[in-house]
């Protein structure tokens, strides 16, 4: 893959100079959805899918960015003196946002760059193509400009900051953290309030993790994602009038139920309930996994989906069909929506001897009920 992209880079930008290659993975979140901006826990793992960059410094301050995924857009040019978001900049707003954040934090970019990007994460799939691109840009800049003091955790934080403040999506830290800190065959149990984390092996002896792409795209910026965050922040302020808490993640289920009437809106109550209960589900799920209790892990995944569908209201008809189909198949241990919502992917844990039947049945029945194919084959098994 890298050799082909380097060759494409040379044809596009010329063969001379110090040409370097980089990669940052996407992620799938096993459980802990919409908890990362509510002070809760998450449990993502990095994927082999991700984003590649081939890059070279320039002698001037020009930026020439090209995506092999959007060939018709050609090379998009700007400069280090023009790091402002714009509709015309399209996908380049993500790397430009990271560059802007580097400069803002005192990491001076002294040269322009030629960059070729290629990603094999489907856009809008909920597998964090934008976070992967942000972390990729951070890793590239750290190496190209020898910012050796920067840690991978700081690169994740830079990615989140740029998406919040340059791209206008009020996301939490999970996606960038999973991309920056991902480790083969492990998920990351992350406390988003403290950034304390531990790796947990997810090599399952008798089951596989299967990702199904609904092929329904979403844009977190244009969707109700920011609304959900605002609703949770308002609910937190209402609860803080009666409780000494810093985040919704500080609460147990019992504490929430005893004090939920402080939240003045039924909708905000539902949003806060999801944040509290999902955080506790995530803690219990990791405990179950450590105890090799995959059945309990699956039940918690199922409960997570119900909460995301009914309380947080970030699912959609196509995703619910995929999950309902999964639940109906013998050998499926658990299934839920993954990612920000409003489309994207489901993640399921499926017993080894049921994987082929799962792929065949879900694929055929989804197409019959929805009218288009889901992205689902042996490559969906991670």
Where is each model-derived feature located?
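Gly/Ser-rich oxyanion-binding loop with an adjacent helix/lid
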Residues: 1-22, 28-32, 38-41, 80, ...
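Glycine-rich phosphate-binding loop
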Residues: 342
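C-terminal nucleotide
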Residues: 1-27, 52-88, 186-334, 349-382
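N-terminal cofactor/phosphate-binding cores enriched in small/glycine residues
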Residues: 32-34, 46-47
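Short Gly/aromatic-enriched secondary-structure transition segments
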Residues: 39-46, 228-229
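A short, compositionally biased micro-patch
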Residues: 46-48, 58, 120, 183
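FabD-like malonyl-/acyl-CoA
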Residues: 132, 345-349
């Amino acid at each position: 893959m890298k050799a082909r992209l380097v060759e494409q880079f040379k044809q596009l930008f010329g063969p001379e100079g110090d040409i370097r290659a980089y990669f940052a993975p996407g992620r799938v979140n096993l459980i802990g959805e919409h908890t990362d901006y509510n002070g809760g826990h998450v449990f993502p793992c990095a994927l082999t899918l991700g984003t590649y960059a081939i890059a070279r410094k320039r002698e001037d301050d020009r930026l020439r960015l090209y995506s092999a995924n959007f060939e018709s857009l050609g090379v998009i040019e700007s400069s280090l003196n023009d790091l402002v978001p714009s509709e015309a900049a399209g996908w380049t707003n993500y790397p430009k946002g990271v560059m802007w954040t580097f400069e803002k934090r005192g990491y001076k970019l002294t040269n322009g760059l030629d960059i070729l990007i290629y990603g094999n994460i489907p856009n809008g799939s909920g597998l964090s193509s934008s976070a992967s691109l942000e972390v990729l840009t951070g890793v590239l800049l750290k190496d190209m400009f020898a910012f050796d003091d920067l840690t991978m955790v700081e690169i994740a934080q830079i990615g989140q900051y740029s998406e919040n403040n340059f791209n206008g999506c009020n996301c939490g830290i999970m996606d960038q953290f999973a991309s920056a800190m991902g480790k083969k065959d492990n998920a990351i149990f992350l406390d988003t309030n403290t950034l304390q984390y531990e790796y947990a092996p997810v090599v399952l002896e008798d089951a596989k993790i299967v990702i199904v792409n609904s092929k329904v795209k979403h844009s977190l910026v244009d969707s109700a994602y920011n609304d959900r965050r605002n609703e949770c922040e308002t609910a937190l302020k209402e609860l803080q009038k009666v409780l000494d808490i810093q985040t919704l993640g500080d609460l147990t289920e019992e504490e929430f139920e005893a004090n939920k009437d402080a939240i003045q809106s039924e909708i905000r109550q539902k949003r806060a309930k999801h944040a509290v209960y999902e955080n506790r589900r995530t803690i219990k799920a990791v405990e179950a996994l450590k105890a090799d209790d995959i059945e309990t892990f699956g039940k918690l995944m199922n409960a997570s989906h119900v909460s995301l569908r009914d309380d947080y209201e970030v699912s959609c008809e196509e995703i619910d069909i995929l999950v309902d189909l999964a639940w109906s198949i013998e050998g499926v241990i658990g299934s839920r929506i993954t990612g920000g919502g409003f489309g994207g992917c489901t993640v399921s844990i499926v017993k080894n001897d049921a994987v082929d039947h799962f792929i065949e049945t879900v694929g055929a029945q989804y197409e019959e009920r929805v009218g288009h194919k889901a992205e689902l084959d042996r490559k969906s098994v991670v």
